[in-house]
Curated annotation (Swiss-Prot):
Cellular compartment(s): Cell membrane
Transmembrane segments: 19-39, 78-98, 110-130, 134-154, 165-185, 199-219, 249-269, 289-309, 321-341, 360-380, 398-418, 440-460
Record key words, sorted: Cell membrane, Membrane, Transmembrane, Transmembrane helix
Alphabetized GO MF terms: carboxylic acid transmembrane transporter activity
Gene Ontology CC: plasma membrane
Bilayer topology: Multi-pass membrane protein
Organism whose genome encodes this protein: Mesomycoplasma hyopneumoniae (strain J / ATCC 25934 / NCTC 10110)
SUPFAM superfamilies referenced in this protein's UniProt entry, alphabetically: MFS general substrate transporter
Keyword Transmembrane helix: yes
Record carries keyword ATP-binding: no
Gene3D superfamilies: MFS general substrate transporter like domains
Official protein name in the record: Uncharacterized protein MHJ_0132
Length: 484
């Protein structure tokens, strides 16, 4: 292992300690809490704190004159650039772990997140965007940094369980960002929230100090323990180039990028597309769509205990994952049909929840969430299940899965955004006639991109081909739990 001054410092006085479950869970909790903080900070920007140029929110702050505000294409380009930056940061995680150790990579990523504290007080919009990009790179790294902890400290059964809970923190953070803008706290409270956007970002940013201080004190240098270094020296030498040459890396990119579309695009595109499909330019159903998204995200809390239970048992994974993702996308299509043909036609009930069609719409969102969020744990546990898996390999692999997955997700975002809002097209001048062709085209793309995951799964190898196929099980007694 080539050393540098940071790694030299990190390796001083390293005393090997037992890799106990309690220490592993503590480190896991600090990192997932940091990830939830990132999701909250990032989500509030698009959920409502952005406001409108010349009126309120951070857009009103930086552009008191609405005519000076950047156009739609510029805003989209900024978002694409930030997402690409997050992808690059994800790819670099594996390299950083090798160069400066896992503990110092975590601390560095949390330091990046501290830029979220000063970003709201930037004197310029450009500075605000740059500082939030640095913050976002650090935040995105958290979900990858979990994996070496899980891989080192937990046995196979514990990994299967913890993989069910790790995904909880994205929906929890996102639900928190949606609640103030879902019509629950009232219009005046919404406006107060939006007017005090700097304080909201400041408070969330300061929470980053909790995992940062916690990891400085409690973080371990498990990857630098002599026993781990000895194991790594006996293993194959890995680099980013090694994984780029492997076909499985690109199959994972297809799978993970497509799954990201399936779970993130409904949050990003549902409001503008749903409104345009019914010819509503006033956002009349904004609150109801927000509640639909909350139901969708709430599916995460049921999914791991239903859909996600497969990880605990000796059953084949690939076809099961593909079926569940397809079912989740199908529920989204059904929910859209119900909204366009029934819920969105009834303006009298736009702000109420007493009609049956509204509840069908909401519960379809819940079923969609149970499928798409519930399967994440099964999917993310796959790299741990392949023969020859080890903490060193998993760290590299997850960095690439997230980084390249984000890149694929960004490409899908650019294509969908350009179809939804083509450059040079003034949406205000379109004759809607209840169906906006651009919005419908974008929606169809979302469905197609979400289903591409099946291609990635078909190309990947089954990690345990000796496990039984779920459809061939005839009684529960045939299903065996995974042994330690």
């Amino acid at each position: 292992m080539k050393k540098n001054f940071i790694l030299n410092f990190a390796t001083k006085n390293v005393k090997e300690k037992k890799l106990s479950f309690g220490v592993g869970i503590t480190l896991w909790a600090l990192i997932v809490f940091a990830y939830m903080i990132f999701v909250m900070n990032w989500g509030f920007a698009s959920a409502g704190l952005n406001g409108k140029a010349g009126i309120s929110g951070y857009l009103g702050h930086f552009f008191p004159n609405a005519n000076e505000a950047p156009g739609t294409v510029v805003n989209q380009a900024v978002n694409w650039g930030i997402t690409i930056g997050r992808g690059i940061g994800s790819v670099l995680v594996g390299w950083l772990i090798v160069k400066i150790s896992h503990k110092y990579t975590v601390i560095l990523s949390l330091f990046f997140m501290l830029f979220g504290i000063i970003a709201p007080y930037s004197p310029t919009y450009a500075g605000f965007i740059i500082l939030r990009t640095i913050f976002a790179i650090g935040g995105t790294m958290q979900i990858i940094l979990i994996q070496p902890v899980v891989s080192n400290y937990l046995n196979q059964r514990q990994k299967a369980v913890i993989s069910q809970f790790s995904p909880f923190f994205y929906p929890i953070g996102t639900i928190i960002t949606l609640i103030p803008f879902a019509g629950i706290i009232g219009q005046e409270a919404q406006e107060a929230f939006r007017d005090n956007w700097q304080i909201v970002f400041l408070v969330i940013g300061l929470l980053t100090l909790i995992p940062l201080i916690g990891y400085i004190i409690l973080g371990t240098k498990f990857d630098l323990y002599p026993s781990n270094i000895e194991k790594r020296n006996k293993q194959e030498k890995l680099s980013l180039a090694t994984f780029f040459k492997q076909k499985d890396t690109w199959y994972w990119t297809i799978l993970y990028g497509s799954w990201l579309v399936a779970v993130v695009f409904p949050f990003t595109f549902s409001k503008p597309i749903f409104h345009r499909l019914i010819g509503d330019s006033d956002g009349t159903f904004n609150d109801k769509i927000s509640v639909f998204l909350i139901f969708f995200l709430a599916g995460m809390f049921l999914g791991p205990f239903t859909i996600g239970l497969l990880s605990k048992y000796q059953l084949q994974r690939r076809k099961y994952i593909s079926t569940i993702i397809t079912l989740g996308v199908f529920f989204y299509v059904l929910a859209t049909v119900v909204f366009v043909l029934k819920v969105g036609k009834n303006y009298e009930y736009a702000k109420s929840y007493t009609d049956g069609w509204t509840w069908l719409f909401l519960f379809l969102g819940l079923f969609m969430g149970i499928c798409l969020w519930g399967i994440q744990g099964v999917m993310l546990n796959l790299p741990h299940e392949y023969k020859g898996s080890n903490p060193y390999r998993v760290g590299f692999q997850f960095g690439l899965i997230w980084g390249l997955g984000y890149t694929a997700f960004t490409i899908a975002t650019i294509i969908t955004s350009l179809v939804n809002t083509p450059p040079g097209i003034d949406l205000k001048k379109l004759e809607l006639n209840n169906v906006d062709g651009y919005a419908l085209g974008a929606y169809i793309l979302i469905i197609i991109f979400s289903l591409v995951s099946s291609i990635g799964l078909a190309l990947l190898k089954e990690p345990n081909p000796e496990y039984k196929k779920l459809l061939k099980i005839r009684s529960f007694s045939e299903i065996e739990r995974i042994k330690k």
